[in-house]
């Protein structure tokens, strides 16, 4: 994986996660706009907005990578690398103002067998 410059990837991810976290924090105590509600899951408008921000930042920096996120996929499904994103990991907690949520971003490398 170091062929992509893992230190550079890590720096990009850190900055992106901090920016996404700032967006989430700015909306912490504001009314939440719910897009979808299920028994054990909730989808907020802010989930979509946060993933859009993350997608822009990561794919601007790494346009040949794919992105697989909780709110949808972008890029070539057969790319050598893909970002895996949960824009608000702990959305239910966040929706109810419980301070246990974060931005989760991982990077996967496609194996020789074609899986991640």
PLM features per residue range, with description:
Residues 1-88:
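N-terminal subdomain of lithium-sensitive/metallo-dependent phosphomonoesterases centered on the IMPase/IPPase/PAP
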Residues 77-116:
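DPxDG-like acidic metal-binding loop motif
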């Amino acid at each position: 994986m170091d062929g992509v410059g893992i230190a550079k990837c890590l720096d990009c991810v850190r900055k992106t996660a901090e920016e996404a976290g700032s967006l989430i924090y700015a909306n912490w105590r504001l009314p939440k706009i719910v897009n979808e509600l299920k028994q054990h899951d909730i989808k907020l408008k802010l989930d979509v907005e946060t993933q859009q921000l993350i997608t822009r930042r990561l794919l601007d920096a790494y346009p040949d990578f794919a992105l697989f996120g909780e709110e949808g996929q972008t890029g070539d499904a057969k790319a050598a690398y893909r970002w895996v994103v949960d824009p608000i990991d702990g959305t239910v907690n966040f929706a109810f103002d419980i301070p246990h949520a974060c931005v989760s971003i991982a990077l996967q490398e496609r194996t020789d067998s074609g899986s991640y």
